Regions:
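Extended amphipathic alpha-helical segments enriched in small hydrophobics
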Residues: 252-276
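Long, low-complexity, mixed-charge
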Residues: 1-49
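Conserved beta-strand/loop scaffold segments within soluble protein domains that form the structured core
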Residues: 32-253, 257-260, 281, 287-298
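Generic structural signal of hydrophobic/aromatic residues within well-ordered alpha-helices
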Residues: 13, 274-277, 290
Length: 298
């Protein structure tokens, strides 16, 4: 068994904060290579390990001006490492929807990468209703006029670990990134979100924003929010914000006035971020998977 470092920040911060990277136990020598699957159009992939440790690669290509949507659903109870490489051409759009529906005790390592040429766009949606641990590392580079929209929803329960790292390089002019991460933590769940917006020299006219909302439902949960904006260009605009806290008394009163006790109110709010994102996607299969997992996978 090896200890590997994953989800590294592009620029290190104070070591005492414990957020520069994450140490993860992984059997590198025993990892089974599941090969590479290439998609050049819309598709749905059901991905599972089939072995105690497995690695798979997915390449998604979109021709110039094309729009491609791919759904990746991760299942099973083992350790799964999936590398998803996005290859949009000029003015193409790739929409990637990932759903973690793995069992408790399972571990998902998801790596998404893209070099987005002129005028292209990536839409990344990640829904985490499953009970497995998730380590996600996303790295994208935007050329002139390219854009990223990223939205993530999660529910951390029991001793679950959710460790997210998203780094977007604004390399070209007039690029745009919008990042929204929302979720809830209950039991003794732990979550880290590192969001980096990196304005490179030559990215004039670019904008980037990241927003996070975290609902804390217990005294034993651990949340770490790490927004990072790097700037080597003057004419850019970068913003970040976070709303973190428990249910306030006004919200509880609202629910109680409609017949819900505290436990029921917390349950409804805990599910809200993932359910809302699934609803907004408008995909029946995704919504069914999310509801199945939120209802206990039974």
């Amino acid at each position: 068994m090896d200890t590997i470092l994953v989800n590294k920040l592009p620029t290190r911060t104070w070591n005492r904060l414990g957020v520069n990277e994450t140490a993860l136990l992984w059997d590198e020598a025993g990892t089974v290579d599941g090969g590479t699957e290439v998609l050049t159009g819309d598709g749905r992939l059901e991905l599972s390990a089939g072995a105690p440790y497995a690695r798979k690669t997915v390449e998604i290509a979109a021709a110039a001006g094309q729009r491609v949507t791919v759904y990746e659903t991760f299942r099973g109870g083992e350790h799964l490492h999936v590398r998803t490489v996005l290859r949009p051409e000029k003015d193409a759009v790739i929409r990637l929807v990932q759903v973690q529906a793995m069992d408790g005790g399972a571990v998902l390592r998801s790596e998404v990468s893209a070099r987005c040429p002129e005028g292209s766009a990536v839409e990344l949606y990640r829904l985490l209703p499953g009970r497995g641990d998730t380590y996600a590392d996303d790295r994208l580079t935007l050329a002139d006029g390219a854009s990223l929209k990223a939205a993530m929803g999660y529910l951390g329960r029991d001793a679950q670990v959710i460790d997210l790292n998203l780094a977007v390089e604004h390399a070209g002019r007039d690029t745009r990134s919008d990042i929204d991460v929302s979720g809830a933590l209950a039991g003794s769940a732990k979550k880290v979100f590192r969001g980096t917006i990196d304005f490179k020299h030559g990215s004039a006219g670019s904008t980037g924003s990241e927003q996070e909302t975290v609902l804390l439902l217990g005294d034993d949960v651990v949340n770490k929010t790490v927004p990072l904006i790097l700037c080597a260009e003057e004419n850019v605009e970068g913003t970040h914000g976070a709303t973190i806290g428990a249910l306030d008394e006004d919200t509880l009163f609202y629910f109680e006035s409609r017949g819900f006790d505290r436990a029921a109110a917390e349950s409804l709010m805990a599910r809200a971020a993932v359910e809302r994102l699934a609803h907004d996607l408008g995909d029946k299969a995704t919504a069914e998977t999310v509801l199945h997992e939120l209802n206990g996978g039974v």
